[in-house]
């Protein structure tokens, strides 16, 4: 009674394949070498099944209800955030409304103000021109400073532009000084 074999059930035979040195990943179908324990593309272990588990109906119902609830709350939260930001902006603008501060340049000598009035049609604009602060004035910048104080005509603007570009720091400093 020791030899019980079922004649109807054949033995499992390995697949006849020409590529014995490789295995195909069950997830990404990448062909890996036989020595590889994990897939070289997706790091899935060799022999991992791709069968998806059946969803539990209670869990699915719970997840579905959670998906629909957060959007309504997030809209309220967004609305509250927007209102809060608006109120903060209003309070900051109210605080700053009583004193208007103009942006100030740090590299400007305020004592060297020169005012120039330009009128076009019925509009008059006053341009206040300041000299740059220099830590140690070289001979070339001192000469350009003399040109500033001597000239007072409307062609003064072109001379100023040229004298600024000949400053020791070059054109970059004059651009930075004027753009702010």
Curated annotation (Swiss-Prot):
Q: Name one GO molecular function term.
A: zinc ion binding
**Phosphoserine: modified positions:** 167
Q: Where are the zinc fingers (RanBP2-type)?
A: 19-48
The protein's predominant localisation is nucleus
* Basic and acidic residues bias locations: 74-93
- The source organism is Homo sapiens (Human)
User: What this chain does, per the record?
Assistant: Binds to MYC and inhibits MYC-mediated transactivation. Also binds to MYCN and enhances MYCN-dependent transcriptional activation. Increases calpain 2-mediated proteolysis of YY1 in vitro. Component of the E2F6.com-1 complex, a repressive complex that methylates 'Lys-9' of histone H3, suggesting that it is involved in chromatin-remodeling.
The gene coding this protein: YAF2
The biased composition feature labelled Low complexity covers: 62-73, 136-156, 163-174
State the protein's name.
YY1-associated factor 2
In the UniProt record, does the keyword Phosphoprotein occur? Answer: yes
């Amino acid at each position: 009674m020791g030899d019980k074999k079922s004649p109807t059930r054949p033995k499992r035979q390995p697949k006849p394949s020409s590529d014995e040195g490789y295995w195909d990943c069950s997830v990404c179908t990448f062909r890996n070498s036989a020595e590889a324990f994990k897939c070289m593309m997706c790091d899935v272990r060799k022999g991992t099944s791709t069968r998806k588990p059946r969803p539990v109906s209670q869990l699915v119902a719970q997840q579905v209800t959670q998906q629909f609830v957060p959007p309504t709350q997030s809209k309220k939260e967004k609305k509250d955030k927007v209102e809060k930001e608006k109120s903060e902006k209003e309070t900051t603008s109210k605080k700053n409304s009583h004193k208007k501060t103009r942006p100030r340049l740090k590299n400007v000598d305020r004592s060297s103000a020169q005012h120039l009035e330009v009128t076009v049609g019925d509009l008059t604009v006053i341009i206040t021109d300041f000299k740059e602060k220099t830590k140690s004035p070289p001979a070339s910048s001192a000469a350009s400073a003399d040109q500033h104080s001597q000239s007072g005509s409307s062609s003064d603007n072109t001379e100023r532009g040229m004298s600024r570009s000949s400053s020791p720091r070059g054109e970059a400093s004059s651009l930075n000084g004027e753009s702010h």
